[in-house]
Every structure is written in C-alpha cells, then in structure tokens.
C-alpha cells in the first residue's frame, strides 16, 4: 500500500537584505504544495491535484494576493495571480531542487522583476 503525499502549508518570510537588515515578517508567502518525505516538491502528485496548489502573498501596503502555483516551461514553478495576464507572474528559482524545511531559503523573482531570498519559517501538513 502506498501513501500519497499530503499538501503542506509552507510559510516564507523575506530574509535579510539591504534595506531590511532583520528581514520582514510582513513581506511573506504561504505556499500549498505536495512534498515528498524528504521535503522536495512532489511533481507527480502535483499533476494529480494542481488546483490544490495555491499561493498567498503579503506585502506591506498591499492587499493580500491569491494565486495558483503552476509548473512552467523547463520545470520552473510560477505563481500566477491573474488568468488574464502574465505580467503578475512570479518565478520561484530552482524550487524543484529545494528542500522545504524551516531555516532553509528559497528565491523568488517578484512581479517587479526583482529577486528576493525568503526564509522558510514553517512547514506543516494542511
């Protein structure tokens, strides 16, 4: 009997960078993704449940953005906030290679074209 990987709730916060020496808890993401036992994105499970894979983005001074997590060309992972446009899409760099566990870091190119590092603060089954 095989068990299917559950969807996990992954919390990210802006890591330290110029202008944010302590990072920024208010600049954050919440990802909902299936993970393997070793903490990598389970791409085969994703293909079975793409509608469950969501993203919430919080930035100071903005409304919370709700979107979908999509698998793009070349295996890239994209955050899509509007079906009508690709100008709001964001790219997670090498997310397929990342291990999602607290204390690790991931990079996201946001809709303004700037890339930021985000610290993984929690990972738990949803």
What are these regions (language model features)?
Residues 1, 68-69, 123:
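Short amphipathic beta-strand and strand-loop transition segments with alternating hydrophobic
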Residues 80-126:
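Short, compact, well-ordered microdomains
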Residues 1-46, 57:
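N-terminal intrinsically disordered, low-complexity, charge/repeat-rich segments that act as generic
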Residues 38-42, 46, 53-60, 95-102, ...:
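Exposed regions on extracellular, virion, or secretory-pathway luminal proteins
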Residues 29-33, 66-71, 118:
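Broad, structure-driven detector of short, well-ordered beta-strand segments within folded domains
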Residues 6-8, 72-75, 100-104:
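A short, compositionally biased
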Residues 50-91:
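Short beta-strand/loop turn elements enriched in aromatics
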């Amino acid at each position: 009997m095989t068990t299917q990987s559950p969807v996990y709730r992954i919390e990210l916060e802006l890591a330290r960078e110029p202008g944010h020496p302590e990072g920024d808890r208010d600049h954050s993401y919440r990802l909902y993704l299936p993970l393997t036992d070793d903490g990598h994105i389970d791409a085969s499970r994703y293909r079975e449940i793409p509608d469950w894979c969501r993203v919430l983005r919080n930035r100071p001074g903005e409304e919370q953005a709700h979107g979908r997590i999509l698998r793009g060309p070349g295996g890239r992972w994209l955050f899509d906030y509007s079906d009508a446009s690709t100008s709001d899409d964001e790219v997670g760099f090498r997310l397929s290679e990342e291990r999602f566990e607290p204390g690790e870091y991931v990079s996201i190119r946001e809709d303004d074209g700037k890339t930021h590092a985000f610290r993984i603060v929690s990972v738990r089954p949803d």
